[in-house]
């Protein structure tokens, strides 16, 4: 999957993956991570997610990484936030006092950028990748998360042959196979959300399971 795919989606505003409300699992389970106020939370492939605004409202500082410039700019403008822009070798850095978004490739994000995080949140990153790239992403994510840091992972699972991703189906077995080498994994909840997703219903997808996991980076 080439970067041009995502750039085109944002340019055409074909962003069905963007949710117009905070994810219910985030609201329900974020307290399970047990972070204090004023701690930093990493959000990979963040888009312009309202979930970041929610995390900021919980008095965390938010560190995101997003490939597309328009997505980053829209996050700040949609929320009425004035930002500053700086540059690193590989990324353009948009920041306010509480939110810093690295615009660029997550695979070139340096470990130093996430060295001080205390938590992380992945709702739309893991499920954005087809199989081979998803495995590469897991390795990249694990490299960016310091030891013993916990976060939430939200996945979708369905019969992949019934719908062309993204989002791509990620099963509990896949999570078990590919994340447990790097993370302790705890399934918190899994529910069928097909009735809330017309796109999947219109394609006659028989079921759509949304799951939330607590991940803790192994030492």
UniProtKB/Swiss-Prot annotation:
Localisation per UniProt entry: Cytoplasm
Enzyme class: transferase
Chief place where the protein resides: cytoplasm
Keyword Iron: no
Entry GO terms, CC: cytoplasm
Catalytic activity: S-adenosyl-L-methionine + a thiopurine = S-adenosyl-L-homocysteine + a thiopurine S-methylether
Protein name: Thiopurine S-methyltransferase
Species this protein is from: Shewanella frigidimarina (strain NCIMB 400)
């Amino acid at each position: 999957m080439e970067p041009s795919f995502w750039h085109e989606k944002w340019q055409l505003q074909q962003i069905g993956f963007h949710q117009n409300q905070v994810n219910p699992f985030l609201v329900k389970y974020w307290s399970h991570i047990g972070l204090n106020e004023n701690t930093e939370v990493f959000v990979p492939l963040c888009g312009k997610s309202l979930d970041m605004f929610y995390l900021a409202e919980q008095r965390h500082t938010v560190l995101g990484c997003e490939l597309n410039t328009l997505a980053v700019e829209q996050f700040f403008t949609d929320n009425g936030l004035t930002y500053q822009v700086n540059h690193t070798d590989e990324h353009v850095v948009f920041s306010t006092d509480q939110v810093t978004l690295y615009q660029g490739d997550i695979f070139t994000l340096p470990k130093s950028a996430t060295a001080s995080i205390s938590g992380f949140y992945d709702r739309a990153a893991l499920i954005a990748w087809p199989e081979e790239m998803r495995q590469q992403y897991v390795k990249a994510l694990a490299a960016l998360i310091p030891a013993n840091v916990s976060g939430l992972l939200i996945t979708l699972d369905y019969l992949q042959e019934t719908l062309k991703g993204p989002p791509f189906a990620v099963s509990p077995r896949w999570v078990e196979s590919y994340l447990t080498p790097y993370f302790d994994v705890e399934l918190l909840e899994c529910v069928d959300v097909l009735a809330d997703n017309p796109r999947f219903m219109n394609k006659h997808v028989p079921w759509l399971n949304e799951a939330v996991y607590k991940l803790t980076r192994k030492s």
